[in-house]
Amino acid sequence: MQYLVFDPRFGAAGDMILSALLALGADRSAVSRAVSAVSNLTIEETERRGIPALSLKTNTGKAHRTLEDIIQIIDAADASAEAKALAKQVFNRIQKAEETVHQSHHVHFHEVGADDAIADVLGSC
């Protein structure tokens, strides 16, 4: 059995997580199809400090969405039912955290509602 240790204690951007998953063998065409509901995805091979890596570029379009808006985008995505369910769980958890922080049930996603953030979550799921 093989193990993968993911330690985000010092932070990890969504595009970094998705790049790592793609470098580990995630299906590039499936990921591109999934994120196409919200963004175009460009994958480039690069090198960082002498280490081969992948660089992702997505559109950074519209932001300021509600959870319902994001759920509609996820539902329209060309992704597996499992990936859609997991992406919805991620955004539901973010919604609950935002409600707690802002002490309100009327939450709008700002950066997290942007096209690139939704693409990062959908692609990683």
Name these PLM-found stretches:
Residues 1-3, 100-111:
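Glycine/charged-rich beta-loop-alpha catalytic/anionic-binding loops adjacent to active sites
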Residues 6-19, 109-125:
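Conserved phosphate/anionic-ligand binding catalytic regions in large, soluble enzymes, centered on
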Residues 23-102:
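Glycine-rich nucleotide/cofactor/substrate-binding loop typically near the N-terminus or early
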